[in-house]
């Protein structure tokens, strides 16, 4: 069983997917975290965070590094790097690198292989999860929220290291890039359950999703 969660950056996908995993006993995977790790790999081999690296060079660097994840933790060469990939420098570049078709193919293949060779149930979140990676998943969700709310959430997560104006501007740019991607663009897929999380708490959102999920299972019996 796969529950696929899609939506824009900072709409609550990771937090909600983690919590749903706990409540339902499903394993959690974030494709966004994988793209962030790849962006970290690129940054480690660049002199300046304002520079970018070619797709071919980055593909080779990925092969030279070990990316892994388990129990909701994400590793680069055996080191838990979650604290290193949630910052403004990664935010600034991750959309650029995730637009490379070759990079998306690597991440999508890795996600599909994990599910294919496992008997576990999964909650997988990320942009294009419901449209490209797992379009036939049993339950598809699209989480959304206003830019102002998303900026405020990220501001609280980052302990005020960036201003609300900076975060809002970054998110608007990110949305524009994600919606214009030739491959894996941000969009609603057919049959998705749309939920605006702007003024809802974590527990409220999870309860709404679980209720909808259970109702769907009853109807399909």
Curated annotation (Swiss-Prot):
Residues the entry annotates as binding ATP: 7-15
Localization annotation: Cytoplasm
Alphabetical list of SUPFAM superfamilies matching this protein: P-loop containing nucleoside triphosphate hydrolases
Keyword terms, alphabetized: ATP-binding, Cytoplasm, Kinase, Nucleotide-binding, Transferase
Reaction equation(s) it catalyzes: CMP + ATP = CDP + ADP; dCMP + ATP = dCDP + ADP
Alphabetized Pfam families for the sequence: Cytidylate_kin
Top EC category: transferase
EC id: 2.7.4.25
GO cellular component: cytoplasm
Family, similarity comment: Belongs to the cytidylate kinase family. Type 1 subfamily.
Matches recorded under NCBIfam families: cmk
Designated name of the protein: Cytidylate kinase 1
């Amino acid at each position: 069983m796969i529950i696929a969660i899609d939506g824009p950056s900072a709409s609550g996908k990771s937090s909600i997917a983690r919590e749903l995993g706990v409540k339902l006993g499903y394993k959690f995977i974030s494709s966004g975290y994988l793209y962030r790790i790849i962006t970290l790999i690129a940054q480690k081999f660049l002199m300046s965070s304002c520079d970018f690296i070619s797709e071919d060079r980055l593909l080779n660097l990925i092969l030279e590094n070990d990316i892994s994840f388990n129990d909701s933790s994400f590793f680069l060469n055996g080191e838990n790097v979650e604290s290193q990939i949630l910052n403004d420098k990664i935010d600034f570049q991750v959309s650029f690198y995730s637009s490379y078709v070759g990079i998306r193919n690597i991440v999508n293949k890795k996600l599909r292989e994990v599910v294919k060779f496992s008997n576990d149930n999964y909650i997988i979140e990320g942009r294009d999860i419901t449209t490209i990676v797992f379009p036939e998943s049993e339950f598809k969700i699209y989480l959304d929220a206003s830019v102002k709310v998303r900026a405020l959430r990220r501001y609280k997560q980052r302990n005020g290291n960036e201003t609300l104006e900076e975060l809002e501007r970054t998110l608007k740019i990110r949305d524009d890039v994600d919606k214009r991607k030739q491959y894996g663009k941000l969009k609603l897929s057919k049959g998705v359950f749309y939920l605006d999380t702007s003024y809802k708490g974590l527990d409220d959102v999870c309860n709404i999703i679980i209720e909808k999920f259970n109702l769907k299972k009853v109807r399909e019996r």
